[in-house]
C-alpha cells in the first residue's frame, strides 16, 4: 500500500480585502464586533432585497486571475447554489458555476522533486456564508449559534487540478499562493478565517475524500497526513475507502466523518436572476500587476547578492520582503543571514509576525554585528530581549543600551590574551593532553576562556589565537 500514489486537489476560499460586502454596502470590518450587527436585508436575504455587485471585488479577482496566468472569460455569470445549512440564511449561496471569471491558470512551486507546475482549474467569485459558533467542542457541541456578520463577505475560490502528490506539496502550494495574494494586496493573511481550504485526497485507484474547512496552513498538511495514513490503513486491512466529506478536528489532529459526498446536481445550480452577466473584457488590459514573489526573488539575488535560498525565504511574504529591504542598505548579505536564519526563528518560536520587530532596532543590531562590537551569541541574546519586551507589551531597549547595561561588548584583544594565559596556568593537564596530540583538549581550553569572558569573544578567533600561543611554547 505504501507505493500507492497520493492524489490531492485543493479548493481555496480567500476573503478579499474590500471595505464592503460582495452584494451590499455592509462593512467587512466585522471581527471583534457584536454578533449580527453588520447585516442588512440584502446579506440576510430578506424578501424584496436586491443584490448589487462590488466592483472592487471584481477588480481584485481579475488581478488574481492575471497573476495566476489564467484565461479571463469575456463574460461570466453568477449562479445560485442551493442547499440548507443554518449559517446559509437565504438557503442558497450566490456563486459562479459553469461560467467562472477565470480558468486554466498555473502556479509554479518547489515540489517534492524539483520545480513543479500546479494547474489552476478555475477562479470564481462568491459570497461567504455566516459563521456557526459551536458551544462546546467543534465535533461534540451542545448547541450552535449563528453569527451573520460574515454573511456576504467577498470570496474568491481557487480550484486546482489534482496535481499535488503529498501533504508537504499542498502546504508549499498554499504558502506560494498566500504570498502571491499578499503581493497583490487583495488579501490579509493575518485576519482570522481569511483563508479556508477544502482538500480532496485519494490514493490511486480508490475513492476521493473531501476534508472541509481547514482554517490554517499547518492544518492542511496535518489533515492530509492523517488522511493518507487512515486511507492506507483501510486498504491494508482489505477495506474500502468511502466517498465522503470529513471534518478536520485541529485540536486532535484527526478527521471525522461528516456526511456522504454530495454531487453537483444536489445543489441545483441555476443562473442568479437578480444579477446581469459580468462583461470584463475592457477591464482586463487596465489591470496592472505589482512585482510578484518570483520576480522579487530574482531581483534580491541580482541586486543584493543574496543566496537563492535566502532570497526564496525573504520573498515568502510581502511584509517580510519589505522589512528586509528596509534593513539591507548597509550590508545586504549580513541582513539576509540575520533576517532569514536568526530573526525568523525567534519570531516563529513566539508565534509573531515580522511586524513585531522594529526595523530601526534591527538595523542598529546589524550595525553592532558588522562593526564587530558584539559576538553572534550576544546578538541573539539582544534579539531575544527585544522580542520578549514586545511580547510583554513593554517598550524594548535599543541594542546599544542593552550592550551597555549588560556589558555585552566584545572582550578586547589584550584582555583575551590575559585570560588565555590564566587558563594555561590553571589547566596543566589539558595542556599536556594537547601536546600529546589530543585535539579535543584545545576545545576544552577554548571553553574555559569563553567562561572567563562570559561568551564575549569570538570562538573561531579565540581557537586560532590559543593554538598560536600554545604552539609557540613548544
Curated annotation (Swiss-Prot):
Allows the formation of correctly charged Asn-tRNA(Asn) or Gln-tRNA(Gln) through the transamidation of misacylated Asp-tRNA(Asn) or Glu-tRNA(Gln) in organisms which lack either or both of asparaginyl-tRNA or glutaminyl-tRNA synthetases. The reaction takes place in the presence of glutamine and ATP through an activated phospho-Asp-tRNA(Asn) or phospho-Glu-tRNA(Gln). Heterotrimer of A, B and C subunits. This is Aspartyl/glutamyl-tRNA(Asn/Gln) amidotransferase subunit B. InterPro entries: Asn/Gln-tRNA_amidoTrfase_suB/E (IPR017959), Asn/Gln-tRNA_Trfase_suB/E_cat (IPR006075), Asn/Gln_amidotransferase (IPR018027), Asn/Gln_tRNA_amidoTrase-B-like (IPR003789), GatB (IPR004413), GatB_C_1 (IPR042114), GatB_Yqey_C_2 (IPR023168), Gln-tRNA_amidoTrfase_suB_CS (IPR017958). Transmembrane segments: none annotated. GO terms for biological process: glutaminyl-tRNAGln biosynthesis via transamidation; translation. Keywords: ATP-binding, Ligase, Nucleotide-binding, Protein biosynthesis. It comes from Methanospirillum hungatei JF-1 (strain ATCC 27890 / DSM 864 / NBRC 100397 / JF-1). GO terms for molecular function: asparaginyl-tRNA synthase (glutamine-hydrolyzing) activity; ATP binding; glutaminyl-tRNA synthase (glutamine-hydrolyzing) activity. Its EC number is 6.3.5.-. The gene is gatB. The keyword Nucleotide-binding applies. Gene3D superfamilies: 1.10.10.410, GatB domain, N-terminal subdomain. It catalyses: L-glutamyl-tRNA(Gln) + L-glutamine + ATP + H2O = L-glutaminyl-tRNA(Gln) + L-glutamate + ADP + phosphate + H(+); L-aspartyl-tRNA(Asn) + L-glutamine + ATP + H2O = L-asparaginyl-tRNA(Asn) + L-glutamate + ADP + phosphate + 2 H(+). Pfam families: GatB_N (PF02934), GatB_Yqey (PF02637). The keyword Protein biosynthesis applies. Belongs to the GatB/GatE family. GatB subfamily.
Amino acid at each position: 500500500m505504501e507505493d500507492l500514489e497520493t492524489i490531492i486537489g485543493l479548493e481555496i476560499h480567500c476573503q478579499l480585502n474590500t471595505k464592503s460586502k460582495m452584494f451590499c454596502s455592509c462593512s467587512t470590518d466585522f471581527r471583534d464586533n457584536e454578533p449580527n450587527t453588520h447585516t442588512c436585508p440584502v446579506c440576510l436575504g430578506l424578501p424584496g432585497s436586491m443584490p448589487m455587485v462590488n466592483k472592487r471585488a471584481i477588480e481584485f479577482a481579475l488581478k488574481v486571475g492575471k497573476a495566476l496566468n489564467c484565461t479571463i472569460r469575456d463574460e461570466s455569470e453568477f449562479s445560485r447554489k442551493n442547499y440548507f445549512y443554518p449559517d446559509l440564511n437565504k438557503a442558497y449561496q450566490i456563486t459562479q458555476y459553469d461560467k467562472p471569471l477565470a480558468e486554466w491558470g498555473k502556479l509554479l512551486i518547489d515540489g517534492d522533486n524539483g520545480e513543479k507546475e500546479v494547474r489552476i482549474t478555475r477562479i470564481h467569485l462568491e459570497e461567504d456564508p455566516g459563521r456557526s459558533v459551536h458551544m462546546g467542542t467543534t465535533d461534540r457541541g451542545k448547541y450552535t449559534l449563528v453569527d451573520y456578520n460574515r454573511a456576504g463577505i467577498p470570496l474568491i475560490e481557487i480550484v486546482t487540478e489534482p496535481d499535488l502528490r503529498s501533504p508537504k506539496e499542498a502546504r508549499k502550494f498554499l504558502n506560494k499562493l498566500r504570498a502571491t495574494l499578499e503581493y497583490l494586496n487583495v488579501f490579509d493573511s493575518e485576519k482570522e478565517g481569511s483563508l479556508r481550504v477544502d482538500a480532496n485526497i485519494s490514493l490511486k485507484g480508490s475513492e476521493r475524500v473531501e476534508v472541509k474547512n481547514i482554517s490554517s496552513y499547518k492544518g492542511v498538511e496535518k489533515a492530509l497526513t492523517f488522511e493518507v495514513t487512515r486511507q492506507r490503513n483501510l486498504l491494508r486491512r482489505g477495506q474500502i475507502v468511502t466517498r465522503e466529506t470529513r471534518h478536520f478536528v485541529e485540536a486532535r489532529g484527526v478527521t471525522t466523518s461528516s456526511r456522504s459526498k454530495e454531487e453537483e446536481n444536489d445543489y441545483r445550480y441555476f443562473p442568479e436572476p437578480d444579477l446581469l452577466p459580468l462583461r470584463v473584457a475592457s477591464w482586463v488590459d487596465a489591470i496592472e500587476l505589482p512585482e510578484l514573489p518570483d520576480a522579487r526573488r530574482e531581483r534580491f539575488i541580482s541586486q543584493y547578492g543574496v543566496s537563492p535560498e535566502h532570497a526564496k525565504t525573504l520573498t515568502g511574504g510581502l511584509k517580510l520582503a519589505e522589512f528586509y529591504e528596509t534593513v539591507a542598505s548597509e550590508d545586504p548579505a549580513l541582513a539576509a543571514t540575520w533576517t532569514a536564519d536568526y530573526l525568523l526563528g525567534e519570531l516563529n518560536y513566539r508565534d509573531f509576525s515580522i511586524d513585531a520587530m522594529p526595523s530601526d532596532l534591527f538595523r542598529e543590531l546589524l550595525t553592532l554585528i558588522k562593526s564587530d562590537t558584539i559576538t553572534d551569541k550576544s546578538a541573539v541574546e539582544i534579539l531575544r530581549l527585544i522580542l520578549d519586551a514586545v511580547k510583554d507589551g513593554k517598550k524594548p531597549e535599543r541594542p546599544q543600551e542593552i550592550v551597555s547595561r549588560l556589558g555585552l561588548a566584545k572582550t578586547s584583544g589584550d584582555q583575551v590574551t590575559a585570560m588565555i594565559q590564566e587558563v594555561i596556568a590553571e589547566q596543566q593537564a589539558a595542556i599536556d593532553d594537547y601536546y600529546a596530540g589530543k585535539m579535543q583538549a584545545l576545545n576544552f581550553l577554548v571553553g574555559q576562556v569563553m567562561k572567563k569572558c562570559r561568551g564575549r569573544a569570538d570562538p573561531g578567533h579565540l581557537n586560532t589565537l590559543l593554538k598560536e600561543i600554545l604552539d609557540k611554547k613548544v
